[in-house]
UniProtKB/Swiss-Prot annotation:
One of its GO terms (molecular function) is tryptophan synthase activity. It comes from the Bacteria. It comes from Helicobacter pylori (strain P12). Pfam families: Trp_syntA (PF00290). Tetramer of two alpha and two beta chains. This is Tryptophan synthase alpha chain. The keyword Amino-acid biosynthesis applies. Its EC number is 4.2.1.20. It catalyses: (1S,2R)-1-C-(indol-3-yl)glycerol 3-phosphate + L-serine = D-glyceraldehyde 3-phosphate + L-tryptophan + H2O.
Length: 262
């Protein structure tokens, strides 16, 4: 219900969803908690939080570096503890996880979904799991009332876009371009055709990700028909550039979010 309530409220206000991505535990768990609280108080629509992984193949150099920083002290138990603290801090904001398949399957699929439900998580996106393998997780997601998010890529066939639209809950993660994550000066591709195809199959909101780093990108995404954006690399870069000064980091994050939301 948290995603539904969020999108209904934004629609009434004629606003786009703005969802930031950061890696849990980057640069450490204490700062990570403060970073995410700053995102919430700055007015973001929802959260997309990554579980650090040793081989994040879908990510570019900026987010890869955040995984490596977090991995110095990361653990599943600490991730779950931080998620509980965030849910206690704010009972209303939608919390989504972005994880790699190996982490989930090594933990145990059903156990993982049960655990994150207990932590107050709303959705999961598995970065490196193709749609064809969806049955490996859908039953556990449904059992524990976790919304499973799937990716719609520019190279996908119409059939695959249909599958992504029909099986995604909460929202559909729509890629602005192929390749890996990373901030861009311009949005390289027009995703309007993909978004139009997705909306023909399902009313589930389509969020645009990969390369979102400027307010102009959000305006472009709205013109393409997207319901919101996910922004990761530009935000994680601020963390990377202020590792020696927490206060400066939080102020710059606050300023960045304030400049992106409209």
């Amino acid at each position: 219900m948290r995603y539904q309530n969020m999108f209904e409220t934004l629609k009434k206000q004629d606003k786009m969803a703005f969802i930031p991505f950061v890696t849990l535990g980057d640069p450490n768990y204490e700062w990570s908690f403060e970073i995410i609280k700053t995102l919430i108080t700055s007015g973001v629509s929802a959260l997309e939080l990554g579980f650090a992984f040793s081989d994040p193949v879908a990510d570019g150099v900026t987010i890869q570096a955040s995984h490596l920083r977090a991995l110095k002290h990361a653990s599943m138990a600490k991730n779950f503890q931080l998620l509980r603290a965030l849910r206690d801090y704010n009972p209303h904001i939608p919390i989504g996880l972005l994880a790699y398949a190996n982490l989930i399957f090594s933990y145990g699929v059903d156990g993982f979904y049960a655990q994150i439900k207990e932590c107050g998580v709303d959705s999961v996106l598995i970065a490196d799991m193709p749609l064809i393998e969806k049955e490996l997780v859908i039953k556990s997601a449904q059992k524990h009332q976790i919304k499973q998010i799937f990716i719609a890529s520019p190279n996908a066939s119409v059939k695959d876009l249909e599958q992504a639209a029909m099986h995604s809950q909460g929202y559909i993660y729509t890629l602005a371009r192929s390749g890996v994550t990373g901030a861009s000066r311009i949005l390289e591709n027009d995703a309007s055709a993909i978004i139009k195809t997705l909306k023909a199959f399902s009313p589930t909101p389509a969020l645009l990700g990969f390369g979102i780093s400027q307010k102009e990108h959000i305006k472009n995404a709205k013109e393409m028909g997207a319901d919101g954006v996910i922004c990761g690399s530009a935000l994680v870069k601020i963390i990377e550039e202020n590792l020696n000064n927490e206060n400066a980091m939080l102020e710059k994050i606050k300023g960045f979010i304030g400049g992106m939301i409209f």
